């Protein structure tokens, strides 16, 4: 379950509103948001290799990411649900 969003654009997309900067991959991003929202545990996300759920390090330590495509990631913190969810190009 998604508890909070760090990125207003990600929240807008989650509510099925058009976000220009996500044009071209909005369907894939929305699918990942739905998967994240439905996940009962972090382990459930990691159970599907296609999600490529991984713990981050460095200045993003404590966060996890799911790949949307080669460039964009769905980043979040996990504490009994997803929090501070954002869609970022952190490369």
Name each model-derived stretch.
Residues 1, 9, 18, 41-44, ...:
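Glycine-rich, flexible loop/turn motifs
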Residues 32-33, 42:
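Short low-complexity stretches enriched in small and charged residues
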Residues 40-64:
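A short, surface-exposed loop/turn module that caps and links secondary-structure elements
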């Amino acid at each position: 379950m998604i508890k909070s969003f760090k990125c207003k654009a990600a929240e807008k997309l989650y509510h099925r509103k058009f976000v220009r900067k996500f044009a071209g991959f909005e369907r894939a991003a929305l699918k990942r948001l739905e998967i994240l929202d439905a996940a009962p545990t972090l382990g459930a996300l990691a159970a599907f290799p296609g999600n490529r759920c991984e713990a981050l390090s460095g200045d993003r330590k404590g966060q996890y990411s799911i790949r949307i495509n080669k460039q964009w990631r769905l980043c979040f913190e996990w504490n009994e649900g997803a929090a501070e969810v954002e869609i970022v190009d952190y490369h």
